[in-house]
């Protein structure tokens, strides 16, 4: 009994395991003593008793830890398991929480239900359990970064794309947020903000480089060095002196636009509003190295020209606009300046080193403006070439009309004193009235297109046809022979038929033949008298007149009579007689009518001969006219005109000898033979136009043969 009283209460029945454990703990509470004392008090083995030996006795050393120490060790083990599960990121934490530990009592849930721990420790344990279960659902956030990237300012639109589709694609494919700065601030590059994971930012940069490289025409992936400090794209700044920034910019920015277009670079004049106007301003030039250098030289040329005092002034060639020169060119001479297939204007541009463009207009004015762009000295050189070319067109070969050349002032009718306009300055053609609309077009668009395409000037004449036929209208084409031929071809394509020449021949004025002015033959412009190339009076006979006053000598005759035409076809001689009687019934005025081969005064000792076919003798009238012309005062500054009076007298004498058959033995009423004269005329026509009449071409029309050919 003393043993029980000393070591603790007597052992209870076996079922209460908890009580036995507590007794054992009480017996082993004091520090372990000598082995004898321990045996006597039953602290280690005896304290366990039959109730607690299976749970606590064997797991603890004699006299060692109780239930509090075991619970702390279990909590530490659970905490370590949770940390391992969190690192693995799997379901290990859940497995650890639901598993039963290898201890002698219940699992974790059983532990929390024990009432031996304070309330705060229970709540902390529950929170740790919930966090371990929610950990796999919310993984830890990845590291994010923001980087500033730069792209060319001109490529921003390409990067954004239509409706922002390109920049959206970059963000979706790379997983990076892309934000572009709204303004470059006058710099050649725009800032782009890239936000995301490092690998996403790197991928977005590669995609931006590819887009910019494709925009510049290079292979993808080669822009990074260019846009961010590379050497393939050059940026150079030159200082513009104070007060000369306006020269570089030009009116409305025209000069700097032309410089950028010609050099193929981008120019930005940096102007700070806070700076003083007397401070030099930097001009930033961006582009390829060679183009940048060329642009710098062009800018310096403009500044140097101003220093020399010549920039912006007007000279004899036209007005300077934005570093260029405007040169007026007569509309009918535009084709000559351009040349066939543009050969002439290309040659001028290559020789002078400039660029020439004709400004668009409505096509109604007498001149077109050729705008020359380039350095000032080269522009002047090109303008000088164009003016020399126009001057050569205005001047014709000198010489009396009886010579082999054309009269001075060009073929046909010229303007003013006959020395204006290129050779072959004007031709008149008849077109059926119902086809005039095809030539003119709606609102005049067709005739304007012909004028612009050929360089000729086509207009409808206000004069009536020579025979007053209302079924035809007269059209006038002015320009060089090449321009006239080109315009004729286009008009013939529109009316689907040939044009009928009307009026004076290429060398002198003369109405159409008696078979009608609308015969579709190429050489029916004049009467079969003297050769047309020498039949007209000298060029200075024409007073100044406008384009509209083309045929002032014509009077509207009676309407066309078919019966008279049939009679004329039956008797050609009678038709020619009627033709001359109608044509020469008008009194000679200030603008004399055409002169057929009038009979010369009879030689000394011979009786006067009547003119053949009823023609009048106008020799004296012509002599008197030329005397009056010679007495008229010349305009100041005009070159002295030669006196062709004697030449014309000699010419008409020779024509009179030809008209009388070559000698006094010829019968007075015989028809003259103009075969040789017509042959010479056609030869000169072929030489002028660069064509050679073939075997079936026009033949000299002597008397009857000429009339049959005209039919």
From Swiss-Prot:
KH domains KH 3 and KH 4 behave as independent binding modules and can interact with different regions of the AU-rich RNA targets of degradation. The modification N6-acetyllysine is found at residue 87. Binds to the dendritic targeting element and may play a role in mRNA trafficking. Part of a ternary complex that binds to the downstream control sequence (DCS) of the pre-mRNA. Mediates exon inclusion in transcripts that are subject to tissue-specific alternative splicing. May interact with single-stranded DNA from the far-upstream element (FUSE). May activate gene expression. Also involved in degradation of inherently unstable mRNAs that contain AU-rich elements (AREs) in their 3'-UTR, possibly by recruiting degradation machinery to ARE-containing mRNAs. The modification Phosphoserine is found at residues 99, 125, 129, 131, 181, 184, 193, 274, 480. The keyword Amino-acid biosynthesis does not apply. Detected in neural and non-neural cell lines. This is Far upstream element-binding protein 2. GO terms for molecular function: DNA binding; mRNA 3'-UTR AU-rich region binding; mRNA binding; protein folding chaperone; RNA binding. The lineage of its organism: Eukaryota, Metazoa, Chordata, Craniata, Vertebrata.
């Amino acid at each position: 009994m003393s043993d029980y009283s000393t070591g603790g209460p007597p052992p209870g029945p076996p079922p209460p395991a908890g009580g036995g454990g507590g007794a054992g703990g009480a017996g082993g509470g004091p520090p372990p003593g000598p082995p004898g004392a321990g045996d006597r008090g039953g602290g280690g083995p005896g304290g366990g008793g039959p109730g607690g030996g299976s749970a606590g006795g064997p797991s603890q050393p004699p006299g060692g830890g109780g239930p509090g120490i075991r619970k702390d060790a279990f909590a530490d083990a659970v905490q370590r398991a949770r940390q391992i599960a969190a690192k693995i990121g799997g379901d290990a934490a859940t497995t650890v929480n639901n598993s039963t530990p290898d201890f002698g009592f219940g699992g974790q849930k059983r532990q929390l239900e024990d009432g031996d721990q304070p309330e705060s420790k229970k709540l902390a344990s529950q929170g740790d359990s919930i966090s371990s279960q929610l950990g796999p659902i919310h993984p830890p956030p990845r590291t994010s970064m923001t980087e500033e990237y730069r792209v060319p300012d001109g490529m921003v639109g390409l990067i954004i794309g239509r409706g922002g589709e390109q920049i959206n694609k970059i963000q979706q494919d790379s997983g990076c947020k892309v934000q572009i700065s709204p303004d470059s601030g006058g710099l050649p590059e725009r800032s782009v903000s890239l936000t995301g994971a490092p690998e996403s930012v790197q991928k977005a940069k590669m995609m931006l480089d590819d887009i910019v490289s494709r925009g510049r025409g290079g292979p993808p992936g080669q822009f990074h060095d260019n846009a961010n400090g590379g050497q393939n794209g050059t940026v150079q700044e030159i200082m513009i002196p104070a007060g000369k920034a306006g020269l570089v910019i030009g009116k409305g920015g025209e000069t700097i636009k032309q410089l950028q277009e010609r050099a193929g670079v981008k120019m930005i004049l940096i102007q700070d509003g806070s700076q003083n106007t007397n401070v030099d301003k930097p001009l930033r030039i961006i582009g390829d190295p060679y183009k940048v250098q060329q642009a710098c030289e062009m800018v310096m040329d403009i500044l140097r020209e101003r220093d020399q005092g010549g920039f912006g002034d007007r000279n004899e060639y036209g007005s300077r606009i934005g570093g260029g020169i405007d040169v007026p060119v007569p509309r009918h001479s535009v084709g000559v300046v351009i040349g066939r297939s543009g050969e002439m204007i290309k040659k001028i541009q290559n020789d002078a080193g400039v660029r020439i463009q004709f400004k668009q207009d409505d096509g109604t004015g007498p001149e077109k403006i050729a705008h020359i762009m380039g350095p000032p000295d080269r522009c002047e050189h090109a303008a000088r070439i164009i003016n020399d070319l126009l001057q050569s067109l205005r001047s014709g070969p000198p010489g009396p009309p009886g010579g082999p050349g054309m009269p001075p002032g060009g073929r046909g009718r010229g303007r003013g004193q006959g020395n204006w306009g290129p050779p072959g300055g004007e031709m008149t053609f008849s077109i059926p009235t119902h086809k005039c609309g095809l030539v003119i077009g709606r609102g005049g668009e067709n005739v304007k297109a012909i004028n612009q395409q050929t360089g000729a000037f086509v207009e409808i004449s206000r004069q009536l046809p020579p025979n007053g036929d209302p079924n035809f209208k007269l059209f006038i084409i002015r320009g060089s022979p090449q321009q006239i031929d080109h315009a004729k071809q286009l008009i013939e394509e529109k009316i689907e038929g040939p044009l009928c020449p009307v009026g004076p021949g290429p060398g002198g004025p003369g109405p159409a033949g008696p078979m009608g002015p609308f015969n579709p033959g190429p050489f029916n412009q004049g009467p079969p008298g003297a050769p047309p190339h020498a039949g007209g009076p000298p060029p200075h006979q024409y007073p100044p007149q406008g384009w509209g006053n083309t045929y002032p000598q014509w009077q509207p005759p009676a309407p066309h009579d078919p019966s008279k035409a049939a009679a004329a076809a039956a008797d050609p001689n009678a038709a020619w007689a009627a033709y001359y009687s109608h044509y020469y019934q008008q009194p000679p005025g200030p603008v004399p009518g055409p002169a057929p081969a009038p009979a010369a005064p009879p030689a000394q000792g011979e009786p006067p001969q009547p003119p053949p076919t009823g023609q009048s003798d106008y020799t004296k009238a012509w002599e008197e006219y030329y005397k009056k012309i010679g007495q008229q005062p010349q305009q100041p500054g005009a070159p002295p005109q030669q006196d062709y009076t004697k030449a014309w007298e000699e010419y008409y004498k020779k024509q009179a000898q030809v008209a009388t058959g070559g000698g006094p033995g010829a019968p007075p009423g015989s028809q003259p033979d103009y075969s040789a004269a017509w042959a010479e005329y056609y030869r000169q026509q072929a030489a002028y136009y660069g064509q050679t009449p073939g075997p079936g071409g026009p033949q000299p029309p002597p008397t009857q043969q000429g009339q049959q050919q005209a039919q």
